[in-house]
Amino acid sequence: MVATGSLSSKNTASISELLDGGSHPGSLLSDFDYWDYVVPEPNLNEVVFEETTCQNLVKMLENCLSKSKQTKLGCSKVLVPEKLTQRIAQDVLRLSSTEPCGLRGCVMHVNLEIENVCKKLDRIVCDASVVPTFELTLVFKQESCSWTSLKDFFFSGGRFSSGLRRTLILSSGFRLVKKKLYSLIGTTVIEEC
């Protein structure tokens, strides 16, 4: 609901005349709508819900990385920059805020880019009871100056034998690609962070 104020049609005097003293000060206020002076209070339930949703999304991303480190990445440790998953979760919530079902309609594909090669890590369905309305593709990036390289793991058969002693260092940068599934135009939004 949007409340707007306007001068009543009964009063033909201009605002400048009213302000210059053409009438007494009380009449000016009575001509404007009450809602122009009321500031809406923040809904604390929404703020708490958004923070909880953000933290749940952070946990889902961290679980995805944890599961993938030995099964798909073949390493013993994944070092994640401080607040990276928090920033990603906030961006995901922002991108889902304009969708008909919000985050519930999201399917997220999580990938890792190493030396221009993308490795699929996981697929996260935010709410299986809702038909997806959009897809997000999250691309983590390996730290470019890191001393470890996992290129050998992707192209060799023995990734578990030698790889479990290695550490993967993630960059603080990431890419989010949003694709609307219900749009006839097929709108795609790419954000590089």
From Swiss-Prot:
PANTHER family, from UniProt?
Answer: DNA DAMAGE-INDUCIBLE TRANSCRIPT 4-LIKE PROTEIN, DNA-DAMAGE-INDUCIBLE TRANSCRIPT 4 PROTEIN DDIT4
What does the UniProt record say this protein does? Answer: Inhibits cell growth by regulating the TOR signaling pathway upstream of the TSC1-TSC2 complex and downstream of AKT1.
Its GO CC terms are: cytoplasm
Q: Where in the cell is it found?
A: Cytoplasm
Q: Name one GO biological process term.
A: negative regulation of signal transduction
| Alphabetical keyword list | Cytoplasm
Q: Quote the gene name from the UniProt entry.
A: Ddit4l
* Designated name of the protein: DNA damage-inducible transcript 4-like protein
In which family does this protein belong, per the annotation? Answer: Belongs to the DDIT4 family.
Q: Does the keyword Endoplasmic reticulum apply?
A: no
Q: Does the keyword NADP apply?
A: no
Q: What induces it?
A: Up-regulated in soleus muscle atrophied by disuse.
Q: Looking at the record's lineage, which domain of life comes first?
A: Eukaryota
UniProt tissue specificity: Expressed in heart, skeletal muscle and testis.
